A protein has these predicted regions:
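Pyridoxal 5′-phosphate
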Residues: 12, 26-438
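N-terminal leader/targeting segments
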Residues: 3-4, 33
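Short, low-complexity intrinsically disordered segments enriched in A/P/G/S/L with frequent Arg
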Residues: 5, 19-27
C-alpha cells in the first residue's frame, strides 16, 4: 500500500491520424437539444469582441447566465428585497418565502429527502471545509484514515491535509489507470480501516465520470462515510443523491447557470443533526444564554449570519431553468458534442494534439484538457483569445493530478448546454491559427 504516492504515470490517448481539413458531419453527432434556441436565453452570446462572436469554452470554470436568472435577481432587488427569517412584515415574509422556495427547488432537483437537507454555503469549497472541520473534528482522531483520489480538486485535498496537520489523521489515495479511470483493483485494500472516502463525481481536468454508486457502496461496506464533490456533474446530468449512496455532497451555483457566491451542501438528515455547527452567530441559534447556546434546527444551524439572499434566489431560478431544459437532454447533448469534438480534433490535428482523458464520450463529460504542438498553455490561450475563443490554461486547481499526468499545465476547453458544433469548429480553426504563429 502506497500512502500519498507521487509516482508519475505518463499516459494519454494521443490523436494519431494525418492532419486534414475535414470536419465530422453533424448528422453523425445529432444533438438532443437545440443549442441555437438555448443560446437566445443567454444575453452574453449577443456580444462580440473585436467584431468576432463569443466562443465560450470555460464552463467547467464558471457558466454563463440565462435571462431568467438575471431578471429574477434584478426584479427581487428592485421590488422585493428584504431580510429573511427575521421580520414579520409582509415584504420580509415574501422574501423568506422566495428564499425557502429556492431551497425546495434545489432539494427536488437533486432528489433530496427534504429541504432540511439543503444547506446554503458560500461555495462548494466552503461546503467541503465545513465537512472536514465540523464533521471531521467531531469524528476523526489521530491515526484515522481518509481516502481520496489522485484526480481531486484542491478543495477536496487541502482541508483534509489541514486536518491531518491538526489531528494526525492519515491520507490514502486511489491511483489512476492508464485510461484515466480510477484504479479500483485494490479499492477493498485501500478502504480497510477508512473512516471517510471523499471523491469527485467527475474530474474537472480529465472529464472522467466516476462510478459514484459503486464507490459509495464500497465505502459503506468498509464502514466509512462517502463524501462526493459533485461540482462537475450536477450541472451536466441528472442527479439523485439518495440513489447515489452518498452521505454528503456539494456543488456550486455558478457552474450551473446560477450566480457566484452561493454553494450547496447536501447531507443525510441524521448526519447533519449530529454534526456540530461550523460558524456561530445570528440565525444559527434558537437560544443564547450567558452560559451557552442552543442551535437552531436544520438547515439554519449551518447558515450563520445574513445569507446571500439574492444569489440563492438566483440559484432557484437557474435550477428551474435547467429543469425546464431537462437534465437528461443536457447530458445527451454533451455526449453528442463530445463525440463531435473528439472526432474533429482527431481528424484535424492527428498526433499534434494530446488529450488527457477517456476517449469514450459515454465515460466522460464535455471537458477536454490537452497539449498542442508543445505550445505552452498560457501562450496558446492568449492566441485563442485573439479569435474570441475562451479557454482555461493552468493547473486547474489540481496540481497533484498535473504531476501524475506529467504536465505543469494544460489548455482546457469545456462545453455546456449552450455550446454548438460551430463552437468546436471555431476552436479547431483557432488552433490552426496558433500553429501559424508558433
Amino acid at each position: 500500500l502506497m500512502v500519498g504516492s507521487s509516482s508519475r504515470v505518463a499516459w494519454s490517448w494521443q490523436l494519431n491520424l494525418k492532419r486534414t481539413a475535414t470536419r465530422p458531419t453533424e448528422a453523425s453527432h445529432k444533438m438532443s437539444i437545440d443549442s441555437a434556441v438555448i443560446r437566445r436565453d443567454f444575453p452574453i452570446f449577443g456580444s462580440e469582441v473585436n467584431g468576432k462572436p463569443l466562443v465560450y469554452l470555460d464552463s467547467a470554470n464558471t457558466s454563463q447566465k440565462p435571462n431568467v436568472v438575471i431578471d429574477t435577481m434584478t426584479k427581487f432587488m428592485r421590488e422585493a428585497y428584504a431580510p429573511i427569517n427575521r421580520s414579520a412584515y409582509t415584504l420580509a415574509a415574501n422574501a423568506t418565502e422566495q428564499y425557502e422556495g429556492a431551497r425546495a427547488a434545489v432539494a427536488k432537483f437533486i432528489n433530496a429527502n427534504n429541504a432540511r437537507e439543503i444547506v446554503f454555503t458560500k461555495n462548494a469549497t466552503e461546503a467541503l471545509n465545513m465537512i472536514a472541520f465540523s464533521w471531521g473534528r467531531a469524528n476523526l482522531q489521530r491515526g484515522d484514515v481518509v481516502l481520496l483520489t489522485h484526480m481531486e480538486h484542491h478543495a477536496n485535498i487541502v482541508p483534509w491535509q489541514m486536518l491531518q496537520q491538526e489531528r494526525g489523521i492519515e491520507l490514502r489515495w486511489v491511483p489512476l489507470t492508464s485510461d484515466f479511470q480510477l484504479d479500483l483493483s485494490s479499492l477493498e485494500t485501500l478502504l480497510a480501516g477508512v473512516k471517510v472516502f471523499s471523491f469527485t463525481s467527475m474530474s474537472n481536468v480529465l472529464g472522467t465520470i466516476n462510478p459514484v454508486e459503486k464507490l459509495c457502496a464500497a465505502a459503506h461496506a468498509a464502514g466509512a462515510i462517502a463524501i462526493v464533490d459533485m461540482c462537475q456533474s450536477v450541472p451536466h446530468a441528472p442527479t439523485d443523491v439518495r440513489a447515489s449512496g452518498a452521505d454528503f455532497a456539494m456543488f456550486s451555483s455558478h457552474k450551473m447557470c446560477g450566480p457566484s457566491g452561493v454553494g450547496v451542501l447536501w447531507g443525510r438528515e441524521a448526519l447533519l443533526e449530529a454534526m456540530p455547527p461550523f460558524l456561530g452567530g445570528g440565525n444559527m441559534i434558537s437560544e443564547v444564554r450567558l452560559d451557552g447556546f442552543t442551535c437552531a434546527e436544520l438547515p439554519s444551524k449551518f447558515e450563520a449570519g445574513t445569507p446571500p439572499i439574492v444569489e440563492v434566489i438566483g440559484l432557484g431560478a437557474a435550477v428551474n431553468y435547467l429543469t425546464g431544459v431537462g437534465m437528461q437532454n443536457v447530458r445527451q447533448h454533451e455526449i453528442a458534442l463530445s463525440n463531435y469534438v473528439l472526432d474533429l480534433l482527431q481528424s484535424r490535428f492527428g498526433d499534434d494534439i494530446t488529450i488527457h482523458g477517456p476517449r469514450n464520450p459515454e465515460l466522460r463529460g464535455a471537458t477536454f484538457s490537452f497539449a498542442f504542438r508543445g505550445i505552452h498553455p498560457h501562450d496558446l490561450s492568449q492566441v485563442l483569445d485573439q479569435s474570441n475563443v475562451c479557454v482555461r490554461a493552468g493547473h486547474h486547481c489540481a496540481k497533484p493530478l498535473m504531476k501524475i499526468i506529467g504536465a505543469n499545465a494544460t489548455t482546457r476547453a469545456s462545453f455546456y448546454l449552450y455550446n454548438t458544433t460551430e463552437d468546436a469548429d471555431a476552436l479547431a480553426d483557432a488552433l490552426d491559427s496558433a500553429s501559424d504563429i508558433f
